[in-house]
UniProtKB/Swiss-Prot annotation:
Alphabetic keyword roster: Coiled coil, Transit peptide
Keyword Transit peptide among record annotations: yes
Domain of life: Eukaryota
Organism listed in the record: Homo sapiens
Stated name of the protein: Coiled-coil domain-containing protein 70
Length: 222
């Protein structure tokens, strides 16, 4: 029974080491994942700021378009200044479209990274759920082992109580046998008198051996 309990304890220790190491690996992965998510959200914030800047540039450019149209309508006589302003306008328009092209490239790169991030995020949480399920199963097995060990302790305690009661019964029986032997000896000494006492002394080893055999037989039977 003792070797069985030792093997149970060793198995329980293995389950505990697995249950203890698994949350540690999971915690490291979670921390790394949270750091990646934090960095990605910072990039998202920067990209949103770029979107707002691009919108401001777009509205500014639209204002310039409206202003240019107003100049076309109001200054037909001032042809030369108009063409100078038109030249400047087309330069600004070229710069704007180049800026838009660059923005679209950044946008394309961003969304590509965005899709990759969410694929990795999905795979991460799938792995995390698998780890969590394994941890839950280990804890359930650990709980079952504890219940088995508790039942063994209860059974062992009952056996010890039975052994204790048996030992008390044996002790009581020995005391009764010793008292009976003393009464028998006193009886023979009292009824047979001196002669019987001498005869008992002569037969003492035989009677003593008989008493020892009786005691040994009684103890062996108990």
């Amino acid at each position: 029974m003792f070797s069985f309990k030792v093997s149970r304890w060793m198995g329980l220790a293995c389950f505990r080491s697995l249950a203890a190491s698994s949350p540690s690996i999971r915690q490291k992965k979670l921390m790394h994942k949270l750091q990646e998510e934090k960095a990605f959200r910072e990039e998202m914030k920067i990209f949103r700021e770029k979107i707002e800047d691009f919108r401001e540039e777009m509205w500014t450019f639209r204002g310039k378009i409206h202003a240019f149209r107003g100049q076309i309508l109001g200054f037909w006589e001032e042809e030369r200044p108009f063409w100078e302003e038109e030249k400047t306008f087309w330069k600004e328009e070229k710069s704007f479209w180049e800026m838009e092209k660059s923005f679209r490239e950044e946008e394309k790169t961003f969304w590509k990274k965005y899709r990759t991030f969410w694929k990795e995020d999905k795979a991460f949480w799938k792995e995390d759920n698998a780890l969590w399920e394994r941890d839950r199963n280990l804890l359930q097995e650990d709980k079952a082992l504890w219940e088995e060990e508790k039942a063994l302790w209860v059974e062992e305690r009952a056996l010890l109580e039975g052994e204790k009661a048996l030992w008390e019964d044996k002790t009581s029986l020995w005391e009764e046998e010793n008292a009976l032997w003393e009464e028998e000896r006193a009886f023979w000494m009292e009824n047979n008198g001196h002669i019987a006492g001498e005869q008992m002394l002569e037969d003492g080893p035989h009677n003593a051996n008989r008493g020892q055999r009786l005691l040994a037989f009684s103890r062996g039977r108990a």
